[in-house]
Amino acid sequence: MEVKRAGTAGFCMGVSLALHKLEMAIEANGSGGSALRRICTYGPIIHNPQVLASYEARGVVCLKSVDGARAGDTVLIRAHGVPMQAEATLRESGAEIIDATCPRVKKAQLAIANSTASGSSLLLFGDADH
């Protein structure tokens, strides 16, 4: 049997950026008994069960609803983005919001919002390389 290894491996730029932002939030917050704030993600930060389990073990809370955000929390918006209304509700909660949305996803979200606001119909196709 021939085994071929992919030329590239690992996380895409957007996921790497989201994980970096989460690490920075954890580092800024302290750890263990000295943690200052609750660190949360709204939904899973990325789609990787092993990574999610490792952050949960470090005390990161995965919110399943925007209603779970509290004033004083630090809440990261996941790499794959959230609907604009969910982001607005999170910001109204009094939590510190860190937008970890992939820049490519955010660009698409803004294009969609601008197109639909002007009454245009929108057909969206994905990036074949992502």
Which residues does each PLM region occupy?
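The feature marks the mature, well-folded catalytic cores of soluble enzymes
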Residues: 1-130
